[in-house]
Amino acid sequence: MIDVNNFHYMKIGLASPEKIRSWSYGEVKKPETINYRTLKPEKDGLFCERIFGPTKDWECSCGKYKRVRYKGMVCDRCGVEVTKSKVRRERMGHIELAAPVSHIWYFKGIPSRMGLLLDMSPRALEEVIYFASYVVVDPGPTGLEKKTLLSEAEFREYYDKYPNQFVAKMGAEGIKDLLEEIDLDEELKELRDELESATGQRLTRAIKRLEVVESFRNSGNNPSWMILDVLPIIPPEIRPMVQLDGGRFATSDLNDLYRRVINRNNRLKRLLDLGAPGIIVQNEKRMLQEAVDALIDNGRRGRPVTGPGNRPLKSLSHMLKGKQGRFRQNLLGKRVDYSGRSVIAVGPSLKMYQCGLPKEMALELFKPFVMKELVQREIATNIKNAKSKIERMDDEVWDVLEDVITEHPVLLNRAPTLHRLGIQAFEPTLVEGRAIRLHPLVTTAYNADFDGDQMAVHVPLSKEAQAEARMLMLAAQNILNPKDGKPVVTPSQDMVLGNYYLTLERKDAVNTGAIFNDTNEVLKAYANGYVHLHTRIGVHANSFNNPTFTDEQNSKILATSVGKIIFNEIIPDSFAYINEPSQANLERTTPDKYFVDPTQLGEGGLKEYFDNTELIEPFNKKFLGNIIAEVFNRFSITDTSMMLDRMKDLGFKFSSKAGITVGVSDIVVLPDKQDILDEHEKLVERVTKQYNRGLITEDERYNAVVEIWTDAKDQIQGELMQSLEKTNPIFMMSDSGARGNASNFTQLAGMRGLMAAPSGKIIELPITSSFREGLTVLEYFISTHGARKGLADTALKTADSGYLTRRLVDVAQDVIVREEDCGTDRGLLVSDIKEGTEMIEPFIERIEGRYSKETIRHPETDEVIIRPDELITPDIAKQITDAGIEQMYIRSAFTCNTRHGVCEKCYGKNLATGEKVEVGEAVGTIAAQSIGEPGTQLTMRTFHTGGVAGSDITQGLPRIQEIFEARNPKGQAVITEIEGVVDDIKLAKDRQQEIIVKGANETRSYLASGTSRLKVEIGQSVERGEVLTEGSIEPKNYLSVAGLNATESYLLKEVQKVYRMQGVEIDDKHVEVMVRQMLRKVRIIEAGDTKLLPGSLVDIHNFTDANRDAFKHRKRPATAKPVLLGITKASLETESFLSAASFQETTRVLTDAAIKGKRDDLLGLKENVIIGKLIPAGTGMRRYSDIQYDKATAPVTETSEEVETIE
């Protein structure tokens, strides 16, 4: 067997007949499989033990030799070698075909490789191969052209005239003769000459043929190997036959297909021996050809061969294709041992890095470890005894299990795993029951809830795997979201509500204005019921020992509330005392206004002071998130995770104490709701009257009515929010960010508003009732449209978004950080991304975490803010924007020169850790996940704006797909191809608008539809590639007009526009990585003196290499233009055939690769997963595995001190 980790590339090619025979261990002569009486394989049959090896370990067929001691003997009675039965998985056989047959992949694939090589049409080939026509192999004196087709009658006629003077053949034999006669060098020369002169269709045909001829010549494949003389038979264990309960047999379809081939082949041999008439032999040969076609790719030609119940049989090609094929089912996604799954329940008492494992599950998962430990501790005498103890679940087993699982992390995964946070590592603790306990804060990352979700557990076995799980995957380490670098573990729901309730202040709380000496005194008073959580009190400032308080502040009294004192207990000591939810208080110091000078107080003391000051807002979800981000910026990840745990415990404790519930009485109905409705009803009547008089059009009336009702809803919403009390439970829930929002509340208490019809158009009759009042039958019916649409949309969206992620991962999986610095001299100019006046992504967000490409000086003081190749930290980014600088050059993935990946400097910081990115990080996969994961949050619908604008703009998920697949967008914009001035805009025929642009040398006119809005006016000067009308630009066209850099920036902007409009933040670098993958190919226009083929797609690096070579030898370089490929196309065009074949169109990719003799250097992740090597990312990179240990010089150090264990 080959050692998987020891080979560096994989090559594929056509197999010669000799090669096939060399693989084989013997010829299969009979179609029999198993003897139904003895259940032994038949001799010379498809399962023959002599050919494929014994069915039982170390035992020959007849039973003469048994046991290992006869290893390697060949039995003299039955001829079976005594060896392991495992060889039946690897030994192949063969069939010697009585007549050559063509391989259907090469003859039938599109384009037909055989046809291109012979310069014959696939129709003609089919006629010859399936015995409908003769092909002239050697014309002799007949005057016929070689490769001419003759019908039966024509052949007879010529044969009578010129007996035995010319050769014409039928079937694959004729094609084989023609293929053997091809002189590849000669063909190449002729084709290259033809390229010089040919044009149009002949040129394209010549280029296609040149590609195939070149492939055969370079790969060393012989064209005649496309015709098979010998057929390989795959090992029997891979096409098994098993007995079912009823004595019947279940068998793989391949056996049926092989049986048909063998039967027909044997019949043909017999006919040839008997010297049967030509027509019978021909018919049999055709049937053999069809049988082999069905075996290789059933259903590719004609009707597929069916088994029982009219089910098409699965041929060899089907074994590879699709989700159930070999690639995706067994090579890329294997099931693993040491895994379990169960329902999840919440574990509020767990620490951030812990999870609860059910006892029984843990025992089963860690069984081998426990068995080993039981034997070592001499609790069990041997392994067998240990096993039975575990199965009986004896008492002593549990203590051992406790010890085994300490410090042994396990991985928890929830499907669908949309991004890297879908699998995280935890330290297990044993729990009773059968549910896995999950820490409440990691639910956001998993997108899990506790309504019956299930999760899977996996055990990392090796020490290295455990170390990686602990260092890289521990939940406490994964606090930031890789897509935008913001914390992903923020408190939610109950935790938010508890902290909100805790920091609430109330005017009428008991003992307001009491003054305390220190916090201990406050907590005692609270415990004894002297003050309430919401009581506003004073505490001597110096008792806090807070480093941010000034001396003056320390001499005063801090005015705060009991709840805030409790809240500040969990905040790190070096922080300011947090008294109000503001960034200033959080980042700098507690505002002066909260410090009261005791000497300045009036008669009423502190109570009077509180009566005259406003209440401070409680801390909501957003502010809690900001606190966590600030702690993360100042301290380590460990401190942050401890802080999160404290915040969680506090939240749960006080949301329990608050006892906040929702009842019908909490929904307050507006008294003047009816008045608002009547008022708007009158407005609608007015509009209808205007329409009836013919003053406005139907569209204008409709838009006005929709606007009136929207306004009514807004007005009701506004008044509702005003009328709510601050202590209303529903208001508290929505205000704190725990659950719900203003719109939900309006529907409960105000009115439901306008609904959309199934077409997406808004129904102009509003639902005026609220849920509190109850809906009428008609209103209920109208609202079902929206509900159903919502559910259908969600289901479709999930599938679409998953498929998008799969394509994105596929195209970017080989982008890995390969080096520290690529030394590029280019950069990307960045500034605000705006759409009209609307800000999409501000400049500061685009530069933070990136490396600068230029020196930036302060425009006034001229001091250097940052030099080239330095990291732009949040502080520096703020300095740059504060200095009034609006654009700068940064290092970007777009301009990176690294082959097969990016370099550290062009990528910037790793958003998941906040540190600089390290060599070996699989940034392509992270980028794909970051773009794909929020896909489910995007909307599906194309907005029907209706009315005046009239154009449907695609948004949401369909727009993202449109961009990444580089399709022509809906609602296309017209762009100018020349620089100049807009000379005139006039009406053309068919109600179109004609825009005339006058340049320096030429004038161009562009047609736009009558309804599209123009973005230019007469006399305006326009740049090349500027848009003349509103809409989306067609990217492929834009590439040829405006060039590479403009197209990259445009695609980046478009992707950001879609996500930001839906409120999803994704960092630029992820989009850059993806867009760069779409633009890595060029199409050769002229080959010059290089070996490149005109019209072919070539990797940009290979193109520059070829030209560098040409310049070196003073030859003519090639010219090419950049090509924009959609992600599906780009994945299939990748250098690695394994990756492409496992993605889509498996047979086409493999056919192509075999002819070219392609070599896969295993650079990406997917290729290595397929063959079972470690992936070349992280610690699996070659630079880490090629280390030599020098044993002789390594110093040996003895450690004698006791090692302390740190708690």
Swiss-Prot record:
UniProt remark on cofactor binding: Binds 1 Mg(2+) ion per subunit.
Q: Name one GO biological process term.
A: DNA-templated transcription
Fetch the Pfam families from UniProt.
RNA_pol_Rpb1_1 (PF04997), RNA_pol_Rpb1_2 (PF00623), RNA_pol_Rpb1_3 (PF04983), RNA_pol_Rpb1_4 (PF05000), RNA_pol_Rpb1_5 (PF04998)
- Residues bound to Zn(2+) 2: C822, C896, C903, C906
InterPro entries membership = DNA-dir_RpoC_beta_prime (IPR045867), DNA-dir_RpoC_beta_prime_bact (IPR012754), RNA_pol_asu (IPR000722), RNA_pol_N (IPR006592), RNA_pol_Rpb1_1 (IPR007080), RNA_pol_Rpb1_3 (IPR007066), RNA_pol_Rpb1_3_sf (IPR042102), RNA_pol_Rpb1_4 (IPR007083)
Q: Name one GO molecular function term.
A: DNA-directed RNA polymerase activity
Catalytic reaction annotation: RNA(n) + a ribonucleoside 5'-triphosphate = RNA(n+1) + diphosphate
| EC code | 2.7.7.6
What job does this protein perform?
A: DNA-dependent RNA polymerase catalyzes the transcription of DNA into RNA using the four ribonucleoside triphosphates as substrates.
For this entry, the protein name equals DNA-directed RNA polymerase subunit beta'
Task: Name the source organism.
Answer: Staphylococcus epidermidis (strain ATCC 35984 / DSM 28319 / BCRC 17069 / CCUG 31568 / BM 3577 / RP62A)
